From Swiss-Prot:
Molecular-function annotations in GO: hormone activity
Function, as annotated: Stimulates the secretion of gonadotropins; it stimulates the secretion of both luteinizing and follicle-stimulating hormones.
InterPro entries for this protein: GnRH (IPR002012)
The name this protein goes by in its record: Gonadoliberin-3
Family assignment from sequence similarity: Belongs to the GnRH family.
Pfam families referenced in this protein's UniProt entry, alphabetically: GnRH
Subcellular location: Secreted
Glycine amide: residues carrying this PTM: G10
Residues bearing the modification Pyrrolidone carboxylic acid: Q1
Gene Ontology CC terms: extracellular region
Keywords: Amidation, Hormone, Pyrrolidone carboxylic acid, Secreted
Length: 10
């Protein structure tokens, strides 16, 4: 499942 918002871990 691909999320609409690209989350950046950090």
């Amino acid at each position: 499942q691909h999320w609409s918002h690209d989350w950046k871990p950090g």
